[in-house]
Amino acid sequence: MNKTLSLLLTTTALVSTPLMADTNKQEMVNQIQAQVSSWIDIQVTPQSSIIQKMVFNCEFYSATPYIKSPDGSESSSGSYRFYAHNGVLGSMTEPFTTQPLPELTMCLKEDFVVTNQDEAQLLFEAIETVYPNHSMFDENFPKEIIEKTNGWHFIDGEIFDDKKGYVVESTPEGKVTKIIRSLNL
């Protein structure tokens, strides 16, 4: 009987020790996650302007995560853009290369058309409020608006001797069907 009790206690001790160690590890992981999470701050800024209200039927936001180090310093790894359309929140495409910007096209007011230079200028300026060009290389670059057979080119800078900007495709009536960020205009 003593041997059985001794064997039972030994087996219980051997089986429960790793479980307690795993529980302690998970508790430490949870504590570390909670501490690091307390270092993160997210600043959300509404991006609103009169020109946006004239062109788009969405609200735009910028979210910037900041990491506060234990020594008190802060760092950020960039901002992210969001839109709200009919009560639905979505994230904006971040154009790092030539690519369509479907959220901008979707957010255009239903009756907005581009049929002349002034309306093209209005759209170009509205796009720049959503996607500001912060490149120091383009600060003094003269912006251009060029009418094409199926839309417009909005040029806002250069990259390796190629012009960059936006391609706006539209119907003959001026209804915008697609907005593309382009690095080779």
Where do the PLM segments sit?
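Sec-dependent signal peptide recognition
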Residues: 2-8
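Hydrophobic helical h-region of N-terminal Sec-dependent signal peptides
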Residues: 9-14
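N-terminal signal peptide c-region/cleavage motif recognized by signal peptidases
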Residues: 16-18
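Short, non-transmembrane alpha-helical segments in secretory-pathway proteins
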Residues: 22-57, 67, 93-146
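Exposed beta-strand-loop-beta-strand "reactive/processing" segments of non-cytosolic proteins
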Residues: 34-86, 139-169
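A short, surface-exposed interaction/processing loop segment used at functional sites
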Residues: 78-110, 162-185
